[in-house]
């Protein structure tokens, strides 16, 4: 009975997705415009991201959390208790200089051992960018043992003509410790919006 219910729900969701995608007006598709960050998100570019920061700052970052029980007005966002801390980053051996690093996520992806991360390139230098981007998002995929759901979802959206962030994969190290494979996701900010709209 439970299995039939799950199957029925899955079929209905697939039908709804199909109806949504088929109703999307043509001409709204994302136009592929090459930019300097294209290579950063190429699927065949398995990034190696090495982060160096004070162990004190790393522990502070890892143990920050958002209180999901806090009182909020309807529609009000959670108070952002995550703060950017100074770090040095290299991507595929290229030093990016001082950046800001913070934890990201709410419940599942806010692990203390392997947190999802945001890298802010304009933390130490106003207007600082890397390949035209002001930040990167590294998702830990803790809730996805396959590690590919986010990548495949965004690829499906783009194939359907919907704007979606570019992404690929990265091996992430902090202070020499290997944290694992993360999804490197284009942050939805001004550079993304200018690229797709």
Q: Where would I find each of the regions flagged by the language model?
A:
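Intrinsically disordered, low-complexity segments enriched in polar/charged small residues
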Residues: 7-8, 17, 29, 67
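Phosphate/dinucleotide-binding and metal-coordinating scaffold of catalytic cores
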Residues: 24-197
